[in-house]
């Protein structure tokens, strides 16, 4: 009698998996304008491969703008298109937003347009963290809720 509720709790706990996506972009194009007042505006075109914990993978391309104040605080806005090479040629488009230090930081990804298996996550947002490697490479880790993960099933 007591085993059934315990089994159900364990079953749902074990199946409560967050969605994780890792992206490894490289900057292809970078241009910036600097002012004498330590204000810098930059445009970046970047792309790289991505993978998630559901076994999906593909290529993501982004256009990103950065406004940096006093050589530290950065306001980042980007628009990306990702192709899923593993699932019925699905695609998703996301926005990147971040206000943090130029060299590292935490921001928010929002799914603004989707096809295929991603249709149920349109409008959802997830936090992401970025770490830069050298000057042109990055590691971006996105972590989404269990609800997000379940909508991809």
Please name every model-derived segment.
Residues 1-6:
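Sec-dependent signal peptide recognition
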Residues 16-153:
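Beta-strand-enriched cores of mature, soluble protein domains
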Residues 11-13:
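N-terminal signal peptide c-region/cleavage motif recognized by signal peptidases
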């Amino acid at each position: 009698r007591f085993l059934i509720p315990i089994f159900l709790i364990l079953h749902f706990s074990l199946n409560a998996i967050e969605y994780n996506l890792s992206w490894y972009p490289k900057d292809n194009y970078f241009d910036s304008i600097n002012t004498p007042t330590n204000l810098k505006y930059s445009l970046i075109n970047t792309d790289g491969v991505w993978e998630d914990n559901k076994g999906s993978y593909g290529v993501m391309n982004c256009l990103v703008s950065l406004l940096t104040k006093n050589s530290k605080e950065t306001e980042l806005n980007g628009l990306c298109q990702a192709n899923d090479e593993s699932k019925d040629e699905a695609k998703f488009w996301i926005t990147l937003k971040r206000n943090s230090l130029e060299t590292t930081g935490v921001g928010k990804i929002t799914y603004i347009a989707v096809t295929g298996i991603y249709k149920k996550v349109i409008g959802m947002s997830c936090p992401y963290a970025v770490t830069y490697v050298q000057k042109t490479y990055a590691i971006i880790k996105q972590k989404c809720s269990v609800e997000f993960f379940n909508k991809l099933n």
